[in-house]
Amino acid sequence: MIEVSHLSKSYGSRPAVQDLSFTVPDGQIYGLLGPNGAGKSTIMNILTGYLAPTEGEVKVAGFRLPEQAQQAKACVGYLPEQPPLYPEMTVEEYLLFAAELKGVKRADRKEQVRKTAHRTGLDNVMPRLIRSLSKGYRQRVGIAQALLGSPELIILDEPTVGLDPAQVVEIRKLIRELGKAHTVILSSHILSEVQAVCQQVLILSKGKLAASGTLEELTAGDRSLEEVFMELTGGNTEEETGEEEAE
């Protein structure tokens, strides 16, 4: 599904990602874990075709980025950390608009929106203005727009930041359900998030890949994920900051 080979990205003279290589096969939930500023958002933007790498090769569903960005984007549903919502629209209006932007055929839009709304638990709020929704429901709307067009790959950037505990539980449950039908990449700096939903983990530190593997592999020898993370990243978990990445 995703092949990344010797990927680097710099902003001027400042490197954000350095010589990164990894492969994501189909059908699992992958966690991209790292402290704020580790390069996660830069990688998300490259994988979704919104940012060109400085060096290296990236393929999504067999399409090379950025040369075949249009074809690759058709295979990807993306939820950025700040969902692109329009508060003056109703949920239904917004999802129909998003379906149109994604090229869903007019004859299929209402049915696809209906099914996606049901899948993401939005049935009862479809007539409501987005501005009237709780943050948890707004996040569901963001996930719903990512699912429109039936993409093979779902990319979620910090999907539970700012949610209350009950909302976090519900969104994590939804992500696990998505993993049954899609390949999912979840970017987070929250250790418990990755432990709760991910089957494979890539740990980043200062723009480099520090470790990768299953949770069982990373925590072999009775070590906790927190201990492994602190050792690899210099002890900066930043779990409670909600701070944006300085990329």
List the predicted regions and their residue ranges.
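A short, proline-enriched helix->beta-strand linker immediately N-terminal to the Walker B motif
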Residues: L148-E152
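Conserved ABC ATPase "signature" region
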Residues: L96, E100, A107-V125
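Catalytic Walker B motif of ABC-type/P-loop ATPase nucleotide-binding domains
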Residues: I154-E158
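ABC ATPase "signature
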Residues: S212-G213
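Conserved ABC transporter NBD signature motif
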Residues: G56-E67, Q71-A72
